[in-house]
């Protein structure tokens, strides 16, 4: 009696960068010949990952985070690789076994935030303005003019030229949020932001400006209880990295990733006749993968009571 062939028993197929590039080059009728070919392909892959962030929510890049809110602090840094926030709540009585509650906090625009008459009013936050910034750290001409202790909330600089009225700075390895500028002083500073540690800084320490993605809440948190800002976000896809790295992409997107890279590489070659075919293959592969990459929970729409029976 013939025996049935056995399966591999594994489900771990993946490709590293070198294999991905080789497959993509073969699809355009070529092969990797030089180190520059590999470098060019890696650059194209990173550009394609940036484009994917513009195509909607990629489920594998979703994660969650928690920010402990502090009385009097309006703005809090998000991780540097944040693309956008998908949902958010204000948590009260955090870590309580019986009284913890997640309460709605509404996202508002910069225009709405600008019209708030008293931005430092304190209470439980009910609105949030999300600043989708580029995470760049830029040098300034400023230096520390007077020694800074680890608990100081006022910092004197040699100059504040180029610094906005409020924002984040980096001195040595510490990120600091300052609430306002008065003369050459930064006032109402909150120390050790963005997972850094408050430290002392000597006269002459260089000051960098950090354009961090962040959230600004209103009202400003009070001290009635401990509040947490709990969020779910979409992060950037990790860089392609070196030749032995696998990509930060689920296996379902491997065909799409290779088809996309082949299309990008095809645009760099002299054989433009293949380009429409490569684009069609990429579009089809993306559509198949994207259709599967979504939540499958049921959606229920309920009209507001005020609109039921309305003649409008």
Language model: regions and residue ranges:
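Glycine-enriched, solvent-exposed interface loops adjoining structured elements
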Residues: 1-138, 208-312
């Amino acid at each position: 009696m013939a025996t049935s062939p056995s399966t591999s028993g594994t489900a771990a197929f993946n490709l590293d960068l070198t294999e991905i590039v080789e497959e993509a080059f073969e699809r355009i009728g070529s092969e990797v010949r030089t180190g520059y070919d590999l470098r060019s392909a890696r650059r194209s892959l990173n550009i394609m990952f940036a484009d994917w962030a513009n195509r909607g929510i990629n489920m594998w890049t979703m994660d969650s985070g928690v920010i402990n809110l502090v009385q009097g602090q309006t703005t809090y840094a998000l991780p540097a690789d944040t693309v956008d926030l998908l949902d958010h709540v204000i948590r009260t009585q955090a870590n309580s076994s019986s009284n913890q509650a997640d309460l709605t906090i509404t996202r508002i625009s910069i225009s709405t935030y600008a019209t708030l008459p008293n931005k430092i009013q304190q209470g439980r936050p009910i609105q949030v303005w999300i600043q989708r910034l580029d995470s760049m750290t830029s040098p300034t001409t400023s230096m520390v003019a007077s020694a800074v202790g680890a608990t100081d909330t006022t910092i004197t600089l040699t100059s504040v030229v180029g610094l906005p009225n409020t924002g984040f700075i980096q001195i040595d390895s510490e990120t600091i949020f300052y609430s306002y500028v008065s003369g050459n002083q930064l006032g109402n500073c909150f120390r050790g932001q963005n997972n850094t540690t408050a430290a002392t800084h000597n006269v002459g320490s260089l000051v960098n400006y950090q354009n961090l993605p962040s959230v600004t809440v209103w009202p400003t948190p009070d001290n009635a209880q401990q509040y947490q800002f709990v969020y779910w976000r979409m992060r950037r896809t990790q860089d392609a990295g070196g030749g032995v790295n696998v990509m930060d992409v689920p296996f379902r997107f491997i065909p799409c990733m290779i088809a996309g890279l082949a299309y990008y590489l095809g645009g760099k070659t002299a054989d433009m006749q293949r380009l429409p075919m490569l684009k069609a293959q990429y579009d089809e592969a993306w559509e198949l993968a994207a259709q599967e990459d979504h939540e499958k929970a049921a959606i229920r729409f309920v009209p507001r009571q005020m609109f039921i029976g309305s003649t409008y």
